[in-house]
Amino acid sequence: MTMAAMITSKNVSDLISNSDIGVLMHGPTFMANPLACSVANASIDLLRDTSWQENVKNIETIFTQELEFAKELNLVKSVRNIGAIGVIELKDDCYAQEIQDYCVKNAVWIRPFGKLIYSIVAYTIKEEDLRKIVKTMIDAIKSIKIENEKK
């Protein structure tokens, strides 16, 4: 039983697959892995037996409140969130490594994507953990020397 399917444009497929066969070769990598199957079943149980939609709504509210503090920072172009995804978009992408290093040093795993500093959290996250993640993202931006200088 396949656990997932993937659809992509030819341009994206060409970028991530160097196969001469002409197809994306990563589709079946974890297909029917016993551990993945067990996790999938547990996930289905969680979806059936919990108030996950309410949890996601609460996460979105917290992201909205906490990301507001990033809007005033010089390096920040915009902030946005939807559901359990929170994003800070920077004006430039040259600070990604500094931001990641700061976050990891402060026990938060963030992997910037170009100018985007983002977090996609589990809908079972504790409120204090979510607030710590967002605060650390913002503190990481504040820690960059240029952030403390005037425009």
Predicted regions, residues:
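Conserved N-terminal phosphate-binding loop of PLP-dependent enzymes in the Aspartate aminotransferase
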Residues: 1-151
